[in-house]
């Protein structure tokens, strides 16, 4: 295989500023996601003083806050953390779909990386598994994705 120039992001959060959006709905799950993201960024050299936690009611409100945060120029990355758990009505589908589309749109339009840490699960047990038990911690994964993307974009 021929040699290709490869651009990769380093996992160094030193000097970067992060906005962490976290929903209050299902906060017993979301707080674990936040803890995972903050711990990860700190282990990568980031400072808690460079992280701002924004609490919102639920997932539907995340895109508008992410848009304002990205446009502010104060943050290198936005990490969106929440948990939408399926109920007996189609409400889950509307909220999950619109929040997902909205967060992706913010990243594309602003050029600021947005980490997607919005759990969309069928059960509470699945959400707990993805917030720090056997399914890993999706807050860590969202923070890692944002950090790596920031560092890659710096090289493009």
From Swiss-Prot:
Its Gene Ontology cellular component terms are: cytosol; riboflavin synthase complex
Q: Please give the start and end residues of each transmembrane region.
A: none
* Reaction(s) this enzyme catalyzes, per UniProt: (2S)-2-hydroxy-3-oxobutyl phosphate + 5-amino-6-(D-ribitylamino)uracil = 6,7-dimethyl-8-(1-D-ribityl)lumazine + phosphate + 2 H2O + H(+)
Q: Which Pfam families match?
A: DMRL_synthase
Does the entry feature the keyword Glycosyltransferase, yes or no?
no
- What are the EC numbers? 2.5.1.78
A single GO molecular-function term is:
6,7-dimethyl-8-ribityllumazine synthase activity
List keywords of the entry alphabetically.
Riboflavin biosynthesis, Transferase
User: Which residues are listed for 5-amino-6-(D-ribitylamino)uracil binding in this entry?
Assistant: 25, 59-61, 83-85, 116
Q: Record-annotated residues binding (2S)-2-hydroxy-3-oxobutyl phosphate? A: 88-89, 130
The record's active-site residues are: 91 (proton donor)
Q: Which family does it belong to?
A: Belongs to the DMRL synthase family.
Known role:
Catalyzes the formation of 6,7-dimethyl-8-ribityllumazine by condensation of 5-amino-6-(D-ribitylamino)uracil with 3,4-dihydroxy-2-butanone 4-phosphate. This is the penultimate step in the biosynthesis of riboflavin.
Name of this protein: 6,7-dimethyl-8-ribityllumazine synthase
Organism listed in the record: Oleidesulfovibrio alaskensis (strain ATCC BAA-1058 / DSM 17464 / G20)
